[in-house]
Amino acid sequence: MAYALPNLPYDYTALEPCISKSTLEFHHDKHHAAYVNNFNNAVAGTDLDNQSIEDVIKAVAGDASKAGIFNNAAQAWNHSFYWNCMKPGGGGQPSGALADKINADFGSFDAFVEAFKQAGATQFGSGWAWLVLDNGTLKVTKTGNAENPMTAGQTPLLTMDVWEHAYYLDYQNRRPDYIADFLGKLVNWDFVAANLAAA
């Protein structure tokens, strides 16, 4: 069962000026599409072909002989998740149960923000920053390259892509500025709250 490249949940210009139309076109239509195509080609005709992409990621994680499948599956999933983590006019602070949980587990929203900024800024090279639910507790973590916290039994709630292709056209080497805009102007807290409620 082929995994389909999802449409962006907003127009290519919707996240400007934080993320440009050019970045979204390259990132979604080229990078994300390539991961999806490579994944589908890699599993076609195998026993993984009829499994969900999440099950494939968990099944092949850590298997060096299936690194190509894992990398493309995880990157396809990570990007699909990432698009939904942003929205036009996003950012600010969450409310309701999510806000209460962040305050309980981090001490304050500001403490969460600092932890998330640190995770994104200190991820050496390519990777992702995440807010996850780990045995009932919210935690910030980071993963290199295509890695996904679901392989460690954690539930992803929010992610930020810190591969250079996510921000370089707009921010060049200023990753901290991209991170600040992501948190302050782009995060889709409704999506994060729904992920927490479903966990």
From Swiss-Prot:
Cofactor: Fe cation
Membrane among keywords: no
Keyword Phosphoprotein in annotation: no
UniProt entry keywords in alphabetical sequence: Iron, Metal-binding, Oxidoreductase
Gene Ontology MF: a single term: metal ion binding
Coiled coil: none
PROSITE patterns according to UniProt: SOD_MN
Cofactor binding note: Binds 1 Fe cation per subunit.
InterPro entries: Mn/Fe_SOD, Mn/Fe_SOD_BS, Mn/Fe_SOD_C, Mn/Fe_SOD_N, Mn/Fe_SOD_N_sf, SOD_C_sf
EC number from the UniProt entry: 1.15.1.1
Catalysis performed (reactions): 2 superoxide + 2 H(+) = H2O2 + O2
Domain of life per record: Bacteria
Enzyme class: oxidoreductase
Residues annotated to bind Fe cation: 27, 79, 161, 165
Role: Destroys superoxide anion radicals which are normally produced within the cells and which are toxic to biological systems.
Family, per entry: Belongs to the iron/manganese superoxide dismutase family.
UniProt xrefs under PANTHER family: SUPEROXIDE DISMUTASE (PTHR42769), SUPEROXIDE DISMUTASE [FE] 2, CHLOROPLASTIC (PTHR42769:SF3)
Self-association state and partner proteins as the record states: Homodimer.
Designated name of the protein: Superoxide dismutase [Fe]
Organism field: Synechocystis sp. (strain ATCC 27184 / PCC 6803 / Kazusa)
